[in-house]
Amino acid sequence: MVFSRRGGLGARDLLLWLLLLAAWEVGSGQLHYSIPEEAKHGTFVGRVAQDLGLELAELVPRLFRVASKTHRDLLEVDLQNGILFVNSRIDREEPCQWSAECSIHLELIADRPLQVFHVEVKVKDINDNPPVFRGREQIIFIPESRLLNSRFPIEGAADADIGANALLTYTLSPSDYFSLDVEASDELSKSLWLELRKSLDREETPELHLLLTATDGGKPELQGTVELLITVLDVNDNAPLFDQAVYRVLLLETTANGTLMTTLNASDADEGVNGEVVFSFDSGISRDIQEKFKVDSSSGEIRLIDKLDYEETKSYEIQVKAVDKGSPPMSNHCKVLVKVLDVNDNAPELAVTSLYLPIREDAPLSTVIALITVSDRDSGANGQVTCSLMPHVPFKLVSTFKNYYSLVLDSALDRESLSVYELVVTARDGGSPSLWVTARVSVEVADVNDNAPAFAQPEYTVFVKENNPPGCHIFTVSARDADAQENALVSYSLVERWVGERALSNYVSVHAESGKVYALQPLDHEEVELLQFQVSARDAGMPPLGSNVTLQVFVLDENDNAPALLAPRVGGTIGAVSELVPRLVGAGHVVAKVRAVDADSGYNAWLSYELQPAAGGARIPFRVGLYAGEISTTRVLDEADLSRYRLLVLVKDHGEPALTVTATVLVSLVESGQAPKASSRASVGVAGPEAALVDVNVYLIIAICAVSSLLVLTLLLYTALRCSVPPTEGACVPGKPTLVCSSALGSWSNSQQRRQRVCSSEGPPKTDLMAFSPGLSPSLNTSERNEQPEANLDLSGNPRQPNPDWRYSASLRAGMHSSVHLEEAGILRAGPGGPDQQWPTVSSATPEPEAGEVSPPVGAGVNSNSWTFKYGPGNPKQSGPGELPDKFIIPGSPAIISIRQEPANSQIDKSDFITFGKKEETKKKKKKKKGNKTQEKKEKGNSTTDNSDQ
């Protein structure tokens, strides 16, 4: 490092001064070098990399460079060795003119990370400019009448150098008449005078030629010369005389044009025209002075004619000449020194350089974003500039050196909150009033993948009908990513899983860009009711971020499966039933049962049975249960009936459109003691050949009659034992009876008129036993029912046996096989009833709907673990949405079912006891009912109709 040295210091003082200077440089972070002006290209200035502590290997990767705007081409750094060298000719007089000190300020910048270094290079002046006079000669007119020691001003030379190189000494060629008088003024300028040493005689010497030489103080010395041409004038021997040799004027730089600066006063002792004085600027005055000032030739007033600028010129030296009108004219000179005072008329200048944009939103704090340079052409407090940044932004200004600031990151950034910051930087000077300037810096925040795609909700529910076409669009998922560009590009994919034994990708797919979900194959409700899977959304950032959303795809059932007939319980083919019916059976006797199942669900699987009308419109003595599929007699068969009936039962579901299947049932009526030959041949929807009857084995009929007689006797004995016990209210075993009541119209009530008890003589109370009372005709009103209390009594005055009809639900019927017998399943058949009779029923896990049931079976939306009261067509009352039917019963409810604790000695009312036995007990009860019906037929001619109504 080269430092300028100052002479006159001792070794100790010099060493101390050097140490202090080095400490100041380390603290300030600025390097100082010095070079002479006019240095050649490649001249060594300093080892910048070494002095800054930078490795040579990192200069090129970090783009180490000179960033100065004004003097960038003068100096350059060699990136191979880190040396600062002269790049082009440096003329000190060009950037610094006549300044005492001349320095070149450089900014050295290194990237990754961004660093700024300041270098000050002092340019030493060399004596490369000789003194220069304005012209090659100066003409001086001197009257011959001038006295000895008279002085005549002459113009000196100017030297573009500074310091000792600009200190001029003048010498005059030898002359008998004149000598050179040099006068140093307090303005560091010299005034030259020719002093008359010998009287002039124009006639003797009209002209004199002298040579004035100016020599500077440089080494080597340089000289400049000018020829002085002295013309001796005659007569007018008194020159004008100024009252002051020097006039001093102070002007503000904002002084208006036309302002009077001063008035010169000069007098001439001569008379007449020789005493008239004319003022004018000296002929050697500069053009700049002539453009800014004007002197009145007669009055001597000097006025300002152009705007002053302190920053351009701080002072002016004006030479004014006063010339009389004599012949030859005589003149005198004075000096007007104009000092310009600074006014705060220049706003600060602000420059933003080295923008490091865009800045990543995860950039660390104190990251340098831009360099800001401020300046003010004013001086003093008017030129002191402070820089500030708009508030409430995540940035701040850090002052590095005088008039240099760095824009750095002060707090964390979030591009999703604000992607571009429009910053306003203000530079304000210290004047009064102060002036300021603003600059806008647009800081763009670069996105970082810090946001995962987000769905509007975590789960979606989709309903799709089955049998959809392949490639059907079923849903569209959409996720939003708050990032930008590729970080916000969302792609969708399935989260693979297994659905049963098949991969999820066999069922659905998702479009990677649009998020549309497609069904790849037709969905089957019977195979998959619910398809639950996840769709993943991932962005294209590095590293990628993602999130999942759950889709629940419910496959809605369509009526795409027709009812299928089940094979008979014993032998036979599907859709063909052949039955033998004795002619002695009464109304309501179950002849056969048509069984069918539907693979659909809900209403699409709810089956109903219809008996097709006979050919020719003939009436047939049979009917089929609307929902049970049981074919029963509608009246007592007689001899007038045909011996064979071919019944067509239409089974259809409740889908849209409804699908059907037809079953053929061949019913043969046989007389007692005959052995009909039975064969069943039928097909679905097509009648086959009529089955031939075969003789009935005599032994089989005898066995049946014997068993029937035994059952009748057992039932009579049992009834007699029950009737022998006197009726007692609540005569059930304490803690065991369960009371279930029903009204005559099929709605549940606690009526005293229609109350029955169901008790069990042993074992725990059975809450699943129920007693039904026969329904009355809906045409009977309350008064009619009160007037006929005996309508519910048999011939002996005892209450009639209830007629419960337990059925399997459709969901259980679908799994029944041909080998399953309804009797073996513990089903108690219904008693006789008319074709229009409808019964309120209770559906549970085991019973199936009766003909009067109008709600779908289990599997069609009804909970299979509840008992629900149903109304048939005879009782059209329907409950509104969200409410229960009147007198609705739920097993175990304390309002309907009560368990009474009777005394130990209480009697059981056996007449009210009903139980559900096995197959033999069922047959006994059937035969007993048939006997009762026969007796009633004899006593009443229309008993069949009455029993049907009951």
From Swiss-Prot:
Biased composition (Basic and acidic residues): 909-923
GO molecular function, one term: calcium ion binding
Record GO biological process: cell adhesion; homophilic cell adhesion via plasma membrane adhesion molecules; nervous system development
Matches recorded under InterPro entries: Cadherin-like_dom, Cadherin-like_sf, Cadherin_CBD, Cadherin_CS, Cadherin_N, Protocadherin/Cadherin-CA
Coiled coil start-end: none
Residues in compartment: Extracellular: 30-697
Cadherin domain boundaries: 30-133, 157-242, 243-350, 351-455, 456-565, 588-678
Main location: membrane
CDD domains: Cadherin_repeat (cd11304)
Localization per Swiss-Prot or TrEMBL: Cell membrane
SUPFAM superfamilies: Cadherin-like (SSF49313)
Signal peptide: 1-29
Regions of this protein lying in the Cytoplasmic compartment: 719-950
UniProt-annotated stretches for the region Disordered: 752-808, 827-889, 901-950
Alphabetical list of PROSITE patterns matching this protein: CADHERIN_1 (PS00232), CADHERIN_2 (PS50268)
Glycan-linked positions: N257, N265, N548
5 X 4 AA repeats of P-X-X-P, as annotated region: 734-894
Cited function: Potential calcium-dependent cell-adhesion protein. May be involved in the establishment and maintenance of specific neuronal connections in the brain.
Protein name: Protocadherin alpha-1
Record organism: Pan troglodytes
Name of the encoding gene: PCDHA1
